Amino acid sequence: MAGPPRLLLLPLLLALARGLPGALAAQEVQQSPHCTTVPVGASVNITCSTSGGLRGIYLRQLGPQPQDIIYYEDGVVPTTDRRFRGRIDFSGSQDNLTITMHRLQLSDTGTYTCQAITEVNVYGSGTLVLVTEEQSQGWHRCSDAPPRASALPAPPTGSALPDPQTASALPDPPAASALPAALAVISFLLGLGLGVACVLARTQIKKLCSWRDKNSAACVVYEDMSHSRCNTLSSPNQYQ
């Protein structure tokens, strides 16, 4: 009787397997633009479009320490990071949301990506925002390729380039004169270790002999030999 139910489950599993790629594709996030260059004080629009079941959407600024800029959910008051408070506007719904960032500063330069909150988190391709000074706006060009997560540029500043004279004035590496001092320290540590070993050996011998007959000749000879050996190691060199 167990055979027919198993055979009925097989077509159901195959149907689920066929529908899984379509469900994952439906959760893809479309983001535009890929790159934009704006002067200081201007605004930029970032659009996040997705289809399928969606709980909400984040806009994150990538970098060494990713930062959530906004969180938007239909019917809920949007959450905005303190740095962008009063500079963010929304239009549309969470399925097709346009985020407008106003009064951009040089420190706002970075890569921003849409993160759709679904059964599995899905990310957009990212938008590279280059905020430049007005006189240098023509120096920066955007490519049509989506930005990479690691392509976070630093805010353009004129003082970022090192002074050639300062760069050539780096301190030289330490000379080899530190080698004798290192050898002296190593020799001192070796001598200290040998002294501690001799003290421990004599202590162990005394404990061993106390367990045996104290009149035993073997213990007396062994202890005398250990004592003479430690004295030989600790005696100074007459030829130095």
Curated annotation (Swiss-Prot):
Residues 1-25 form the signal peptide. Residues 202-240 are cytoplasmic. Disulfide bonds join 35-142, 48-114. It is a single-pass type I membrane protein. It comes from the Eukaryota. The keyword Transmembrane applies. Residues 26-180 are extracellular. Residues 140-172 are annotated as: Disordered. Its main location: membrane. The chain crosses the membrane at residues 181-201. Interacts with SECTM1. This is T-cell antigen CD7. The lineage of its organism: Eukaryota, Metazoa, Chordata, Craniata, Vertebrata.
